[in-house]
Amino acid sequence: MTLALCHIPPASLTELLPKELSHHLCIADVIIRTDNADYARFYRRQSQAGKFVILDSAAFEGECTSPQILSAAARIVRPAEVVLSDDPTSATRTLTMSQECARIMRERGYAGRFMGVPHGKKLREYTQNAADLLEACGVSTFGVVEEIPETLGIPRAEAVSVLRSLFPAIDIHLLGVSEDLNELTDPYLLQQARSCDTAKLIVWGLQKTLVAPGDVPPYPGREALGGRMQYFEYVTTDVFAWDAAIANIETWERVLCAVSSGAS
């Protein structure tokens, strides 16, 4: 297994993503906006073409996405997997929110896979939350957040290793990558995680910045393009900026293949 990258573009630039990408992640709040019909159509077509499309909330973007919004977006996109609601500050609240989200989505006809996002202040609480999500919600995937080193005090790869040992049949998805992109050159993570989402390579590219292993510049953040949510509304006709974004994507797709091949 080689990790698949889900690149997150602004709504206006989805059609320029490389056609060979096998996995995608889209945001429910952007899907249901009537002014983003092209964004919704793009991800619906990816689902119809057999690509693995993950539907996520806009929690990272600072929005409070309801299960009703997730359900409405799921009816449009027909994703392979939906990320259940969570609360990064509370394992108990995460379980309650995920159960409610899963219940509402099933009642509204969603029959696909769920991704649960475990949380905890200690490793034991974290793994118990993962076990509870598996039992209560029937999740097929665990989403491992980028902030693991800050919340648990261990490397992200260690959290993945623990989940792998306890739940070998459950897929792992990395929610975001760190600003130094170290996850994308870690042979263990590339072999053990199914997929990973990030907007970083595109954000750098739209700033006309090329990024390669050993040459990772400071990350400007989505704020450079308007903000976390405003990023999806970003529009540019600068072909040099998009060429740089595509170059970053292609560079790191080659890196993933090379590192994974060397580890196998």
Predicted regions and their residues:
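Non-catalytic, usually N-terminal nucleic-acid engagement modules in DNA/RNA processing proteins
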Residues: 1-106, 243, 252-264
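Eukaryote-skewed repeat-based solenoidal scaffolds used as protein-protein interaction platforms
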Residues: 73-205
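Alpha/beta catalytic cores of nucleotide-metabolism and tRNA/nucleoside-modifying enzymes
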Residues: 1-15, 70-71, 110, 135, ...
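Phenylalanine-focused residue identity feature
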Residues: 42-43, 52, 60, 114, ...
